[in-house]
Amino acid sequence: ALDLIVAKKDILRVKKDLLLPGGMPNIFALLWKSCQIREMTFRVLDGKLQATGELSLFFFYEEESETKKAVWYETTVPVSVAIECQGVREGMLEQIGCSIGHLEIEAKADEDGEERVILLDLVLDLDIRIYEETNLSMIEDLYGVAKQADVVRGKGQYRRLLVKNTAKTRVSDQFSISPGMPQLQQICGSFGEVFVQEIKKQSDGVLVKGTVNVQILYESAEEEVPCGCLKGELVFEELLETAEPVKNTCSCRIEASLEQLSVQAQNEQEAEVRAVVCVKGLICADCEEEIVTDALLRAPDPEKQANQPGIVVYLAGEGETLWD
């Protein structure tokens, strides 16, 4: 049986001071900022959860100069944080949803008084569910020795794990600039968000279909419109395989996230977009068995008891055993 041990909401706070590389100009003002989750995994330990992953950070800013030229900067921020979680231990199964709940990115001065430090203050919202597989014992029948036992039967329900799986799928496509938009000169940054559109239960597993909504910020050669935004959609599907058919009564918890996103300019009108989507699933079957729920004990029937033999002998036939 699969038992739900922990079901709660929590947060994970990430605070980092990031220093601009030497070749980047000082910051005059932040214009636009973005932070995305990449490759976030969780591991159950004794009394805590270990979160490991990366954040993709991107921002536009005006440089500290007479021209106030717009400059962009992109980097990755590693994350490794332990989260206290009472009642869990290593070996339990996790299914944790993770999303950005609060984001602050500010510029501040370094030791020399120059605006070159980026303060990242991020809060991740966690939807935590921890499960444990246990052996389930059920009473199917009983009898009384000193008394007559009248058995009361009923239906017992329990949940059984079919599969807990993580699969990755690669998707790619060509995006074209819409008429009237400035021509593409250089890619500045790319951003994506995953949406699950359909979860289909079938004989060989659970088929997950969805889309990745992509936005590409690029630099153009036109002075009047120095930047442009290219939008598009990637379609993905992934099968989480199971050893037995997934019935409509089965429960599925599916989490899909964007693990990698890369964009390469092909020419002034097109860009090639590649993405890796991570699909995590916990699929369970809701089972029902007839079990003994109660027993009514009463004095044995004297007449019936008197007619019972004192000993019974059974002679096994050829090929039979005692347990047949």
Predicted features, each with a name:
Residues A1-Q308:
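Membrane-lipid interaction segments
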Residues D301-D324:
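Primarily a LysM-type cell-wall glycan-binding module
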